[in-house]
């Protein structure tokens, strides 16, 4: 907690505020109403604005514009929204707050903000309360955080606490809020590695805004403890405010739920399609949802169950929980679908591709939850149509242009969901059977695993298991639990010792085509040589390290690996002997360097070409370069077709032939982001104030690799193959320059060899191969016919060899050189004649045993699988099958006769002979 003096503001004193302690929760708050006894925050105070709006009615667009214009009029610069997928962050997948736009580089002071002070209305996505959406009356997955931010330094303060509260108060009073209804509640805040005192702004029981005064940073040895973590003072201090756009609109309308305030048209449309009557003009009906929202606002839905909430509401309106469920459940699903489809509009509009990992996992989670609720409501409408309704209400032209792609993505997801439901029942049945035998219920961990690994919704698991009489552990907040485990990127802690040297001068950026350089040895660090300057490129960004030699007075030291730690380049050499102060000459393996440079620049071109052909949703998911080939992983919602692949290859080679200059320059991060946006971070987010920007035509990325200076230097680009490395990610493997020529020559050699074998020109290969294939198919038919005739003749012979064993006809025979198919046909034909067959044969250097049991043998208890297992030991193998037909095999052809005899003995024993 923060001491009282953190909140003793001049503004509060001059405006007649008094500091009070809430009689309910014990928290401190500021109010103009001296008689007030509670803080205004639920559960201390219920929602009083429902049915009694706190200011004039506003829609989303008008409220947003009013807010932004207000702060522009007070000296703030309006900043455009950031994407909801946090491309500039490597620790989170989604933009969860407006301050996330400026973490970590601006908040840490490394990079100046885009404006100071600034105002923004930032769409955010939080899935922590996913299961409460629709049920609570107030929770949303997607919301706009209107904000004004100030980034103060010790040298220059723009404004701090007093002015922040003054602006907030002026905004509220200007909207018509009763001054005495406003409370400012003291509350410590922490998030994203920062912390500070904050004030929650409450009106009518609803938190409209939070004013955070960020002045602490996470520090394990810090003097301040906030929410169990230690913090120390920051060099800068930041005004971080968040005003909930949707909450302001709700407070202005006083509707029973936030969904009726924010999505009135969508809710009405979905209600009509689902055949659900939603008449908020009916006082009794509206009061049910209003009471639900008021009660939900008073309790923690993470701790209380939906059943408890239903019971309390039912008691308050003198009805049964069952009747209440019938009234509310359909509308709760409609509310959630309205919310979720807006969430999907932002996710897919900003380029997320549904998959099983990272942000794609979260998108698929929302899609499948939406589809499940649509199924429950029997909504016969494509999901894409509802998302299109949402997009039509959002003012983003580029989204409308991409609607065809978004529709295709959602259609594919619907198909995949249907397939999942089909296979899910079978899988759950097996698991339910397992837990049924143990006498327990299916645990939560199993349900999470079913969803994470196979995409099977918990509701399907509950229905399927319930039909088998098995209970499941399914909490009300299941989806919130799952979402929380996937909301942040995995942070891998790699322990490395920082080299005690100045940063190495990196000559490879300024002299990329020089082969030789002179340098001084600064020292040896963990077996690697540290120089004051180097041309050797260290491994990084998917590009392998350079190789070459260091030469001292004629003595050669082979450099076989190069790494960089904290700006210090480490040269791993095979020989020992170098010492600090030695002067050396370095020579680079330029053939390797140029192969890497060609492949690296080609990667940028192929990535850009894929965007042109497949769509702007394509985003680099990984890359690796080598001397002889490169690979690029891209986000895409389906397999790349052959035609699309050809188009990408052609587009890439056109970029080569255009001889586009490759421009590399170091730029301040904020300037690069302002000029080029977040496409800069296709290959990841580099650290530091200054970043290296590589421009290859329309492809512009932050990149530290080596490149050619003109696309014409790349030479040909040949795509070798594609594969789906994971759901939602396609891998394109290609070669460039000399490596591409070698791959083309290898394919030419294969074609030439094939043409030589068939004795036709290469141009006639397809026609000739097709003709041979057709002839081969015809010959196969003839061969099959002949095999059947031969088998028929053999059957007559074998039938005559059958011996009677206690009333069962059995034939045991070594068929010589025979494949498994021939043996199976013969054995099947014999069993149809009610003859049990034990047949052996050899093919391709391996022995094969097939056993079939006729009707009379089955009646007497003969089991083909048992006979095969007894026989297969003698050929060094095993086998199995069904009682009427089984087969086995092994490498010991010489033991075939003994195996057949063993099979016969097993049959006799079974027949008690």
Curated annotation (Swiss-Prot):
It catalyses: tRNA(Ala) + L-alanine + ATP = L-alanyl-tRNA(Ala) + AMP + diphosphate. Transmembrane segments: none annotated. InterPro entries: aa-tRNA-synth_II, aa-tRNA-synth_II/BPL/LPL, Ala-tRNA-lgiase_IIc, Ala-tRNA-ligase_IIc_anticod-bd, Ala-tRNA-synth_IIc_core, Ala-tRNA-synth_IIc_N, Ala-tRNA_lgiase_arc, Ala-tRNA_ligase. Keywords: Aminoacyl-tRNA synthetase, ATP-binding, Cytoplasm, Ligase, Metal-binding, Nucleotide-binding, Protein biosynthesis, RNA-binding, tRNA-binding, Zinc. CDD domains: AlaRS_core. Its cofactor is Zn(2+). Its EC number is 6.1.1.7. GO terms for cellular component: cytoplasm. It is found in: Cytoplasm. Zn(2+) binds at residues 600, 604, 703, 707. GO terms for molecular function: alanine-tRNA ligase activity; aminoacyl-tRNA deacylase activity; ATP binding; tRNA binding; zinc ion binding. Binds 1 zinc ion per subunit. GO terms for biological process: alanyl-tRNA aminoacylation. Catalyzes the attachment of alanine to tRNA(Ala) in a two-step reaction: alanine is first activated by ATP to form Ala-AMP and then transferred to the acceptor end of tRNA(Ala). Also edits incorrectly charged Ser-tRNA(Ala) and Gly-tRNA(Ala) via its editing domain. Belongs to the class-II aminoacyl-tRNA synthetase family. Consists of three domains; the N-terminal catalytic domain, the editing domain and the C-terminal C-Ala domain. The editing domain removes incorrectly charged amino acids, while the C-Ala domain, along with tRNA(Ala), serves as a bridge to cooperatively bring together the editing and aminoacylation centers thus stimulating deacylation of misacylated tRNAs. This is Alanine--tRNA ligase. It comes from Methanothrix thermoacetophila (strain DSM 6194 / JCM 14653 / NBRC 101360 / PT) (Methanosaeta thermophila). The lineage of its organism: Archaea, Methanobacteriati, Methanobacteriota, Stenosarchaea group, Methanomicrobia. The gene is alaS.
């Amino acid at each position: 907690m923060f001491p009282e003096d953190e909140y003793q503001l001049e503004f509060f004193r001059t405006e007649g505020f008094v500091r009070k302690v809430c009689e309910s929760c014990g928290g401190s708050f500021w109010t103009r109403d001296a008689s007030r006894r509670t803080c205004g925050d639920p559960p201390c105070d219920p929602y009083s604005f429902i049915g009694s709006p706190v200011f004039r009615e506003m829609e989303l667009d008008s409220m947003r514009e009013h807010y932004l214009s207000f702060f522009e009029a007070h000296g703030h610069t309006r900043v455009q929204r950031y994407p909801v997928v946090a491309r500039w962050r490597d620790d989170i997948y989604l933009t969860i707050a407006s301050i996330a736009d400026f973490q970590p580089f601006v908040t840490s002071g490394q990079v100046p903000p885009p404006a100071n002070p600034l105002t923004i209305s930032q769409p955010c996505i939080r899935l922590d309360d996913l299961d409460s959406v629709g049920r609570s009356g107030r929770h949303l997955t997607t919301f706009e955080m209107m904000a004004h931010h100030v980034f103060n330094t010790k040298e220059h303060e723009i404004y701090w606490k007093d002015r922040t509260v003054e602006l907030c108060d002026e905004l509220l009073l200007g909207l018509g809020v009763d001054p005495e209804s406003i409370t400012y509640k003291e509350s410590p805040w922490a998030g994203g590695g920062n912390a500070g005192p904050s004030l929650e702004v409450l009106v009518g029981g609803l938190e409209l805004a939070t004013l955070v005064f960020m002045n602490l940073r996470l520090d394990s040895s810090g003097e301040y403890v906030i929410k169990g973590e230690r913090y120390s003072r920051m060099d800068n201090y930041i005004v971080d405010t968040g005003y909930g756009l949707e909450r302001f609109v709700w407070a202005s309308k006083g509707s029973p739920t936030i969904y009726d305030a924010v999505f009135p048209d969508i809710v009405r449309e979905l209600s009509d399609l689902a055949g659900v009557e939603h008449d908020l003009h009916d006082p009794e009906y509206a009061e049910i949802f209003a009471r639900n929202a008021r009660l939900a606002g008073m309790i923690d839905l993470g701790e209380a169950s939906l059943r408890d909430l239903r019971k309390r509401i039912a008691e308050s309106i003198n009805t049964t929980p069952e009747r209440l469920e019938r009234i509310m459940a359909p509308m709760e699903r409609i509310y959630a679908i309205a919310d979720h489809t807006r969430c999907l509009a932002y996710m897919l509009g900003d380029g997320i591709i549904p998959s099983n990992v990272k942000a794609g996992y979260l998108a698929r989670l929302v899609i499948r939850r939406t589809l499940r609720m649509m199924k429950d409501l029997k909504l016969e409408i494509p999901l894409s149509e509802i998302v299109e309704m949402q997009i039509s209400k959002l003012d983003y032209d580029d989204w409308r242009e991409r609607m065809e792609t978004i529709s295709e993505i959602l259609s594919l997801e619907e198909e995949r969901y249907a397939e999942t439901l089909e296979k899910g029942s079978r899988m759950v049945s097996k698991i339910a059977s397992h837990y049924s035998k143990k006498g327990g219920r299916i645990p939560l961990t199993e349900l999470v695993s079913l969803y994470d690994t196979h995409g099977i919704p918990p509701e399907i698991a509950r229905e399927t298991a319930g039909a088998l009489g098995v209970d499941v552990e399914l909490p009300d907040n299941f989806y919130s639990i799952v979402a929380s485990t996937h909301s942040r990127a995995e942070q891998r802690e790699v322990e490395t010792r920082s080299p005690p040297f100045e940063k190495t001068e990196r000559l490879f950026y300024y002299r990329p085509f020089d082969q030789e350089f002179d340098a001084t040895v600064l020292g040896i660090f963990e077996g690697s040589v540290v120089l004051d300057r180097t041309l050797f490129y260290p491994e990084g960004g998917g590009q392998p390290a350079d190789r070459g030699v260091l030469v001292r007075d004629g003595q050669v030291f082979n450099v076989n690996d190069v790494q960089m730690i904290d700006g210090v380049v480490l040269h791993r050499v095979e020989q020992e002997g170098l010492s600090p102060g030695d002067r050396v000459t370095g020579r680079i393996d330029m053939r390797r360097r140029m192969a890497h440079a060609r492949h690296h620049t080609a990667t940028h071109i192929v990535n850009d070409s894929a965007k042109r052909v497949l769509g702007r949703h394509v985003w680099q998911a990984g890359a690796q370069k080598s001397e002889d080939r490169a690979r690029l992983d891209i986000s895409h919602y389906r397999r790349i077709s052959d035609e699309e692949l050809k188009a990408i290859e052609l587009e890439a080679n056109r970029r080569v032939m255009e001889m586009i200059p490759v421009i590399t320059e170091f730029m301040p991060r904020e300037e690069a982001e302002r000029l080029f946006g977040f496409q800069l971070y296709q290959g990841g987010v580099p650290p530091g104030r200054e970043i290296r920007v590589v421009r290859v035509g329309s492809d512009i990325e932050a990149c530290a690799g080596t490149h050619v200076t003109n696309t014409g230097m790349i030479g040909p680009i040949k795509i070798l193959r594609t594969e789906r490395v994971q759901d939602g990610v396609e891998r394109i493997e290609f070669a460039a320059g000399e490596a591409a020529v070698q791959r083309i020559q290898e394919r030419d050699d294969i074609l030439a060899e094939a043409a030589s074998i068939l004795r036709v020109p290469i141009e006639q290969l397809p026609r000739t191969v097709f003709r041979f294939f057709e002839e081969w198919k015809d010959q196969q038919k003839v061969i099959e016919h002949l095999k059947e005739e031969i088998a028929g003749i053999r059957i007559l012979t074998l039938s005559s060899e059958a011996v009677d064993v206690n009333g069962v006809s059995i034939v045991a025979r070594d068929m010589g050189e025979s494949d498994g198919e021939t043996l199976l046909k013969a054995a099947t034909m014999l069993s149809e004649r009610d003859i049990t067959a034990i047949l052996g044969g050899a093919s391709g250097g391996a022995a094969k045993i097939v056993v079939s049991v006729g009707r009379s043998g089955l009646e007497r208890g003969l089991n083909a699988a048992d006979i095969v297992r007894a026989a297969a030991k003698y050929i060094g193998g095993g086998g199995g099958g069904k009682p009427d037909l089984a087969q086995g095999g092994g490498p010991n052809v010489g033991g075939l006769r003994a195996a057949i005899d063993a099979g016969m003995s097993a049959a006799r024993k079974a027949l008690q002979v």
